């Protein structure tokens, strides 16, 4: 339904909405007089957007706007459209972009969140923006910095998620709000609208064709088309792929989440990975999808790679508090998910990541999980998982209840069911590591909670089932090469293997010993190279 070839069909004009923000300013700001600094900023912001001065737009967007928000609008809304319009000569495009920031600020800063009317108006404003750029027969004359384009798409998906949760919470709605939701605005923040927009941006930019051409060593410009040659459309298309990854993850469709990224070589850096928050968000959702698909090795590699990247580049974005908060939270979430994966699928990881796990006392909880503590598994999952949503709202005749947690509870049940299947595998692994041969009856007696009882046929059968489960769970699809994150080969993730011959278990240790020589050789060569460079500078 949403293929790359499907043309943009508009589809939003039929809603018949009003373009203004009625009473937003009156409701949130109490008609405070606009500060002179804010007036000058808005007029200058409009001018540089008209002139397409990207570096200055980025400076105003990343530095001045957050600074003014802290100084004048920390707990209240920015000026309404009506207050701003006369300052910018009613520039329609600027007002659309300004309202995007206005509603984003409402979602982030206003206690209790935006009202229903503000949520609806925010959706309509996004419709205006996408209707401005998508149906156009030629590229629009608009240049915005990549960071704004990324955060615009990211915020678009976030507000969809936020509205889905708001709509599922029926207990705090008035009769008037329920009537507005059920009768007048059934298509607002609809999942099909979100998918339609994101797929249309991907299609218009031909970003998939460009990525495939680049991977094949060809010129992406040759397949980019009229729109895809422009950085504005190309980057919107790329960020929309990441947006689709997030949407499908929120819906619990992990296979499709990875599939939409097929042109992107997830495990390689590219020219598009220059926005830290985009790269981190991509790795978070990819790693989580891999974990839920029981591809633990791929999840561990994804999390380890991005956590190393964060360690090395944190100083680049630490000064930007509005990005730093989100990055810090996702970093903590990924350490929790990595801990889960390492318990379910033990393997070696980078020493610096291990050090963080030790310093932050993850090892205590990891030990509890290895001992089968289901509560720790659940708590880690609830903290680290995305905020799942249902693709459809509660039916009109549904009882007045809070349905927000339904989607989360479903995903928790799926995850915990998998954990319960593996609950005793760490114990089996610990016993097998001690022997090269082990009689089945002896292992059965070790596993028996009541050692004074004799091992009967039923207990023996249960043990054989667990051993078969061990074999099965340790075999996973692992990505090896190619642009599709779904491809891979079956590999054993365990450090030991075994087979059963009659009543005897034969165990082989398959652990590869560390080659410390290679590590020291690389470090010596790196030091020598650094020494040569220092001597060259002195000379």
Curated annotation (Swiss-Prot):
Location(s) in or outside the cell: Cytoplasm
InterPro entries, sorted: eIF3l, PCI_dom, TPR-like_helical_dom_sf
Highest taxon, organism lineage: Eukaryota
Example of a GO cellular component annotation carried by this entry: eukaryotic 43S preinitiation complex
Protein biosynthesis is among the record's keywords: yes
Keyword set, alphabetical order: Cytoplasm, Initiation factor, Protein biosynthesis
GO biological process entries: formation of cytoplasmic translation initiation complex; translational initiation
GO molecular function, one term: translation initiation factor activity
Domain (PCI) ranges: 302-514
Function: Component of the eukaryotic translation initiation factor 3 (eIF-3) complex, which is involved in protein synthesis of a specialized repertoire of mRNAs and, together with other initiation factors, stimulates binding of mRNA and methionyl-tRNAi to the 40S ribosome. The eIF-3 complex specifically targets and initiates translation of a subset of mRNAs involved in cell proliferation.
Similarity remark: Belongs to the eIF-3 subunit L family.
HAMAP family in alphabetical order: eIF3l
Protein name as catalogued: Eukaryotic translation initiation factor 3 subunit L
Species assigned in the record: Anopheles gambiae (African malaria mosquito)
């Amino acid at each position: 339904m949403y293929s790359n070839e499907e043309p943009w069909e508009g589809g939003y004009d039929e809603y018949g909405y009003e373009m203004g923000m009625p009473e937003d300013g009156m409701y949130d700001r109490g008609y405070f007089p606009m500060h002179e600094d804010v007036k000058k900023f808005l007029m200058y912001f409009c001018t540089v957007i008209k002139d397409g001065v990207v570096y200055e737009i980025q400076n105003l967007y990343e530095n001045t706007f957050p600074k003014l928000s802290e100084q004048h609008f920390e707990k209240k809304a920015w000026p309404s459209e009506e207050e701003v319009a006369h300052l910018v000569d009613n520039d329609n495009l600027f007002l659309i972009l300004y309202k995007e920031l206005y509603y984003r600020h409402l979602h982030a800063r206003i206690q209790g969140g935006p009202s229903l009317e503000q949520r609806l108006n925010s959706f309509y404003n996004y419709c205006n923006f996408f209707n401005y750029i998508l149906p156009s027969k030629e590229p629009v004359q608009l240049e915005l910095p990549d960071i704004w384009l990324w955060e615009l798409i990211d915020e678009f998906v976030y507000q969809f998620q936020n509205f889905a949760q708001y709509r599922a919470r029926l207990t705090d709605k008035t009769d008037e709000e329920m009537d507005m939701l059920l009768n007048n605005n059934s298509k607002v923040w609809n999942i099909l609208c979100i998918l339609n927009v994101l797929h249309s941006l991907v299609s218009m930019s031909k970003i998939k064709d460009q990525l495939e051409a680049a991977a094949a060593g060809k010129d992406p410009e040759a397949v980019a088309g009229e729109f895809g040659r422009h950085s504005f459309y190309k980057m919107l298309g790329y960020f929309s792929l990441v947006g689709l990854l997030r949407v499908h993850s929120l819906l619990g469709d992990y296979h499709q989440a990875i599939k939409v990224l097929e042109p992107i070589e997830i495990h390689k850096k590219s020219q598009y990975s220059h926005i830290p928050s985009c790269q981190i968000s991509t790795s978070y959702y990819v790693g989580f999808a891999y974990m839920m698909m029981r591809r633990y090795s791929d999840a561990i590699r994804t999390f380890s790679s991005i956590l190393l990247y964060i360690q090395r580049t944190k100083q680049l974005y630490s000064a930007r508090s509005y990005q730093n908060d989100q990055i810090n939270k996702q970093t903590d979430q990924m350490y929790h998910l990595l801990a889960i994966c390492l318990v379910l699928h033990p393997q070696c990881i980078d020493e610096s990541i291990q050090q963080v796990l030790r310093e932050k006392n993850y090892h205590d909880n990891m030990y509890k999980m290895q001992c089968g503590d289901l509560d720790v598994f659940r708590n880690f999952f609830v903290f680290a998982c995305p905020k799942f949503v249902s693709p459809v709202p509660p039916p009109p005749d549904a009882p007045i209840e809070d349905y927000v947690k339904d989607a989360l509870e479903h995903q928790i049940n799926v995850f915990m069911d998998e954990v319960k299947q593996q609950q005793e595998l760490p114990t089996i692994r610990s016993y097998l590591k001690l022997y090269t041969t082990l009689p089945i009856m002896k292992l059965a007696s070790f596993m028996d909670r009541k050692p004074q009882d004799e091992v009967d046929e039923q207990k023996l059968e249960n043990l054989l089932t667990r051993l078969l489960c061990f074999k099965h769970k340790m075999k996973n699809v692992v990505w090896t090469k190619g642009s599709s994150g779904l491809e891979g080969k079956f590999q054993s993730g365990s450090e030991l293997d075994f087979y059963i011959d009659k009543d005897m278990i034969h165990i082989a240790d398959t652990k590869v010993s560390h080659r410390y020589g290679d590590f020291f050789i690389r470090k010596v060569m790196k030091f020598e190279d650094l020494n040569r460079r220092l001597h060259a500078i002195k000379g």
